[in-house]
Structures are given as structure tokens and as C-alpha cells.
A protein has these predicted regions:
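A generic membrane alpha-helix/interface feature
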Residues: 43-45, 53, 83-86, 103, ...
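Membrane-embedded alpha-helical segments that form the functional core of polytopic membrane enzymes
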Residues: 32-80, 113-116
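Single, functionally critical "micro-switch" positions that shape active/binding sites
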Residues: 26, 64, 84
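Topogenic membrane-insertion module of multi-pass membrane proteins
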Residues: 1-53
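Helix-loop junctions at the membrane-solvent interface of multi-pass transporters
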Residues: 25, 45-49, 75, 102, ...
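Juxtamembrane helix-capping/reentrant segments at transmembrane boundaries
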Residues: 11, 15, 19, 68-89
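A feature for the membrane-embedded catalytic helix bundles of lipid/isoprenoid biosynthetic enzymes
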Residues: 1-18, 87-132
Length: 132
């Protein structure tokens, strides 16, 4: 519901940054992998109770994820790039409940249920891509 409103505000800036990065021959795939690398640091941060730093990492991951798409739109998308992007995103999404489960083991069941919903979402998304 908020996504269209936020995208209207965020997308122009991401598009300008993506164009600038694309002109400097930056790789959208490299940004996808870098976003995952940054994002995975959320696991120990959450486990150690560093929620302030974890929030910054999550926001940085989302920024990098927005930039990889903007770069791809300027340089041209590829099937592999789309696959890599969604795989890196799903791996990052899984990292967040894992970190919370490590921080509060009593929440492990809820984290597992959330992870199961991510698996179903990813399977549905990738299964639909096979049919397309």
C-alpha cells in the first residue's frame, strides 16, 4: 500500500544514481553480490543485540538493492542478473529472522515459520519464471 508512494519519492534518486554508476561501467550483478555481503552482516549484529547497527545494515542493503536494479535498467537487464538479484534478496531476507532467532532463541519457532513463508514465496516466484 505504501510502496507506490515511496517509489514515487525514491525512484528518481535511484535512477539518477543508477545512471551515474552505469556510465562508470559498474556492474548490477556486482551490486547484487555486494548487497548480499553487506546484508549477511545483519546476522551477528542481531544475534549480539546490536539492533541499531542491524537497522543501518538493513537500510544499506535496501539501498544497494535499489541501485542494482537502477544500474541494470540503464545497462540492460539479463536473465542471469534477474536470477542473481532475487537469489541475493531472498538470502538476505532469510538472514534477518535467523539473526533474531539467535538473539532470542525463544523466537526460533516464529523465525522458522517466517523462513518457511520466504521459501514458499521464492518457490512461487521462481516457479512462475519457469512457466513464462
Amino acid at each position: 500500500m505504501l510502496d507506490p508512494l515511496l517509489r514515487r519519492w525514491i525512484d528518481p534518486s535511484l535512477d539518477r544514481a543508477g545512471a551515474w554508476l552505469a556510465r562508470r561501467d559498474m556492474s548490477a550483478n556486482a551490486f547484487s553480490v555486494a548487497g548480499l555481503a553487506v546484508g549477511l552482516t545483519v546476522i551477528p549484529l542481531l544475534a549480539w543485540g546490536r539492533y541499531d547497527m542491524a537497522l543501518l545494515v538493513i537500510l544499506l542493503n535496501r539501498l544497494i538493492d535499489g541501485l542494482d536494479g537502477a544500474i541494470a535498467r540503464h545497462k540492460g537487464t539479463t536473465p542471469f542478473g534477474g536470477y542473481l538479484d532475487i537469489m541475493c534478496d531472498m538470502a538476505f531476507y532469510a538472514a534477518v529472522p535467523i539473526g533474531f532467532a539467535l538473539a532470542q532463541p525463544g523466537n526460533a519457532l516464529w523465525a522458522a515459520l517466517l523462513l518457511a513463508s520466504f521459501v514458499c514465496t521464492a518457490s512461487s516466484f521462481l516457479g512462475r519464471a519457469v512457466l513464462a
